Structures are given as C-alpha cells and as structure tokens.
Amino acid sequence: MAPGVGGYRQINKALNICAFEEYLESQQTHLSSLPNVEQISPRVIRVLGQNPGKFTLQGTNTYIVGTGTKRLIIDTGQGIPEWADLIRETLSGGDFLLSDVLLTHWHGDHTGGVPDLLRMYPDLTPRIFKNTPDRTQQPIVDGQIFKVEGATVRAVHSPGHSHDHMCFVLEEEQAMFTGDNVLGSGTAAIEHLSTWMVTLKQMQSHGCKLGYPAHGAVITDLQSKIGSELAGKLRRERQALQALRQASRNGSGGPGKGRLTVKELVAAVHGDRIDDGIRVLALEPFMDEVLRKLAEDGAVGFDMRGVLKNAIPDIKARKRFR
C-alpha cells in the first residue's frame, strides 16, 4: 500500500507516514496469516480487502453479518478488484444477498469498494449508511439498530480515530466491530487523543468480550485489549510529565516551571539516539498530541515562540509544566 493511501495522511498533517516504515515493517513480520475469506463465527464472515500494508496490516477487513438470505456488510475495503471478486464469489456461493452497507468511517481503505459494490449490486444504492453521510449516503446515529436474520447490530458513535467513526455491537455474540479505534495488532493512528481515550472507555462500557477489528485478527479479549491501549497512552503521558518535572527541578524556565521544546521532550522520553527522520516526522507530532491532551487536562501550559497571528503554532513551540 502506498504511503498516505486510504486517508491516513489526513489524520495528522504533520505526520509523514514514510517515517514509520522501518517500525511498521518489523511489526508486519510478526503478523499471523489470515485466509482471504473465513467464517469466524456462526454469524460473521470476514473477507480481506486485498490491500495488505504497513497501516492496513493483513488488509482491511470486510464483515458479512447474519445467517439468512439477507445480510449486512461492514466496510468495503479500498477498491481493489480482487476484493470485489471475493465478495461476489462469497455471496453467490452462500446463496444470500446484502441488505445494508455500514461504513465505520470515511477513510478510503474502508469506503473505496463502494463503487464496485454498487456496480455489482445496484439495488444497494439507497442502502449505504455512514455517520455524517454525503448526499449519496444514509445517516447512522448512535444507538441505531440494524437487523437481519440471526443478527442484531447496534451502532455506537466512537470518535477518536476520526470524527465520524462508528463501532457496531453484535448483540447475539457480545462482540464489537471496533473499526480503526482498536486494531487486531499494534495501535491505531489517532485524530484526537483526548477524544479517543474517552471513546475507548465508552467502548469498554458495552461489556463486549470479542472484538472484530477493521485490521488484523479477531481480538479474543476485547476488555483487556482496550485496557492495554489506554495504559500505553497514559504511560506516555506520565513519561512526558516526569521529564517536565525533572526540567523544573533543574531550574529550566524559572522557579517551579519545567520548560522543554518538543524535541527535547522526545529525547528525554525516547533517548537521544533516535533517527532524525523518525523523531521529526513521527515522534514529535505524537508528543505534540500528548501535550495538547495534557494541556486540555490542565496539566501543562503552552509558551509559544515565534508564532505569527492567525498562523498555526510551530511544532517546536515550547511547553511549560505547571
């Protein structure tokens, strides 16, 4: 998958996806192999999007849900022709049709297959559902229910990875389609850290045991996985605060104030031997998001320098611990 394809570049304008390549390639080597089509539960068939990559893992998962002659489909892959072939073969082989198309969010690796789906099944044209829809789609709202034989699917608005992100609870299985908020392996790119953390706690509150992620294998203990995701982000917050406290003890920024640039803070947390490209293009933007969350929480203050009126603050603006 080419860097930036599928909507990821838009998540954080300062993030250059290429900077993650070495890390993501090493992560990919540990991924389990998944079949192109697999019946993963009595009610759920998973179809791979045929778009494996550094951010998509084994590929975008499409889920076909239900047990009868009419079924739901969740997400549509990236628009790879081989994916469309798999969908057609799966439907004809199982002798069932699709009633509704549910999209977790707007990114291209989830919505790119819609044109192929409508070309094959034009009757679905008025049955494409998405939160904050465009003029060709129908809305999904929090709590909305979609029912087919053998499956009751409840929509859960879950912003964080993207503003329009939806998860879906499969009531009969105590399972949740987690979209890109929680992946089968590793952690997702995040549009807004503070919102994402609130959302993950909300996702936990539904009490689902299984997770069907948009990328990666089935999550067998969703509660534990969500807990680990939250703990990892909180650990980064603590490390950032610890570094700022140390700076305050050293007198940087004046009495009781720890003042560090984002560059200095990344070095304090990750060490000073990090590749410059990864530091500038990956770690600094993420640390900036951590600091913005801490500022929202009232834990740190901003001391901007060299900022023009109406301009976006430089990522190297200095941060002040309170």
UniProtKB/Swiss-Prot annotation:
Q: Which catalytic residues are annotated?
A: 109 (proton donor/acceptor)
Keyword Hydrolase in the entry? The reply is yes
Entry EC no(s): 3.1.2.-
InterPro entries the UniProt entry points to: LACTB2-like_MBL-fold, Metallo-B-lactamas, RibonucZ/Hydroxyglut_hydro, Sec-metab_biosynth-thioest, WH-like_DNA-bd_sf
Quote the pathway field: Secondary metabolite biosynthesis
Which terms in the Gene Ontology molecular function aspect does this entry carry?
A: hydrolase activity; metal ion binding
Indicate which residues the UniProt annotation says bind Zn(2+) 1: 105, 107
Q: Where does Zn(2+) 2 bind?
A: 109-110
Report whether Nucleotide-binding shows up as a keyword of the record.
Answer: no
Q: Which reaction does it catalyse?
A: atrochrysone carboxyl-[ACP] + H2O = atrochrysone carboxylate + holo-[ACP] + H(+)
Cofactor binding, note field: Binds 2 Zn(2+) ions per subunit.
Question: So which cofactors does this thing need?
Answer: Zn(2+)
**Keywords annotated in UniProt:** Hydrolase, Metal-binding, Zinc
Query: Which processes are annotated in GO (biological process)?
Result: secondary metabolite biosynthetic process
What's this protein's function? Atrochrysone carboxyl ACP thioesterase; part of the gene cluster that mediates the biosynthesis of the tetrahydroxanthone dimer neosartorin, which exhibits antibacterial activity. The two different monomeric units appear to be synthesized by the same set of enzymes, among which the Baeyer-Villiger monooxygenase nsrF is the key enzyme for the divergence of the biosynthetic routes. The pathway begins with the synthesis of atrochrysone thioester by the polyketide synthase nsrB.
**Family under the similarity heading:** Belongs to the metallo-beta-lactamase superfamily.
Q: What is this protein called?
A: Atrochrysone carboxyl ACP thioesterase nsrC
